[in-house]
Regions:
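Major-groove DNA-recognition helix of helix-turn-helix-type DNA-binding domains
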Residues: 1-23
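FIC/Doc superfamily catalytic core
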Residues: 23-35, 40-241
Length: 241
């Protein structure tokens, strides 16, 4: 179908030289991209018995919770609602979580009442969580060291059933922006290094501190850096195959 469209010189695609996918022969090939109109053209070329299946598959793409919540994270910035978020408070973190996961999780913005664990690490017990969150909220956040410590403690608390990392990284950036006039360019922090540092942080936060310090930028109103940061934040949460 791709070749047929190209022969007909339709407005089709560009080569995505940075994105290669594995084909059935086991080799990786550069991919083509089309817009909505191009997709409809492709469907029209497919034999009718198969076109409905293909169309249903296409409509299902981009519909995961991650994709939808990422779009909401973009909108949080684009709409200006991010400027209404309480900075450095539990309520502020709940506001972020409620916005980017609203309509996707029933518990969006709600503090969990159940115990959770990940990778063998148990986060703050639910029965003590409210007290822990009050203590974290009252932690000082005037310097980078203090802000990173507060971020680490909030990660250990993990106040939501799901979506903690994505929400808390935005929360961290707002604190940095308010108190030291910087925020993190997450594209400068390697995924493996970040995840390793966060695993170590309950015992030793020096590694995550150095990663964050090395990725700080003064360009706090740069839309591109923020949007790229959202992409990297969601990338950190993806399970590597």
């Amino acid at each position: 179908y791709w070749n047929a469209l190209k022969r007909r010189k339709g407005e089709l695609s560009t080569i995505c030289r940075q994105l290669k996918l594995t084909a059935s022969d086991g080799k990786k090939y550069m991919t083509d991209v089309v817009d909505d109109e191009g997709v409809n053209t492709i469907i029209a070329l497919i034999p009718s018995k198969k076109s409905l299946v293909f169309e249903k598959w296409l409509k299902g793409m981009g519909s995961s919770i991650d994709d939808k919540s990422k779009q909401k994270a973009y909108e949080l910035f684009e709409s200006g609602m991010i400027n209404e978020i309480e900075v450095g408070t539990v309520k502020g973190l709940q506001q972020i979580h409620a916005y980017i996961f609203g309509g996707l999780y029933d518990f969006a913005g709600q503090i969990r009442t159940m115990n959770i664990a990940k990778g063998g690490f148990a986060f703050a017990p639910a029965m003590y969580l409210q007290d822990n969150l009050r203590q974290i909220e009252n932690m000082p956040d005037d310097t980078l060291e203090q802000i990173v410590d507060k971020y680490v403690e909030m990660n250990v608390a993990h106040p939501f059933m799901e979506g903690n990392g994505r929400s808390t990284r935005i929360w961290l950036d707002l604190i940095l922006k308010k108190h030291i006039k910087k925020f993190v360019d997450w594209s400068k922090i390697d995924k493996k290094a970040y995840l390793t540092a966060m695993q170590e942080s309950p015992v030793d936060s020096s590694h995550i501190y150095e990663l964050i310090k090395g990725a700080l930028t003064n360009d706090i109103n740069n839309r591109e850096i923020f949007m790229k940061g959202i992409d990297y934040s969601y990338y950190y949460e993806q399970v590597d195959e």
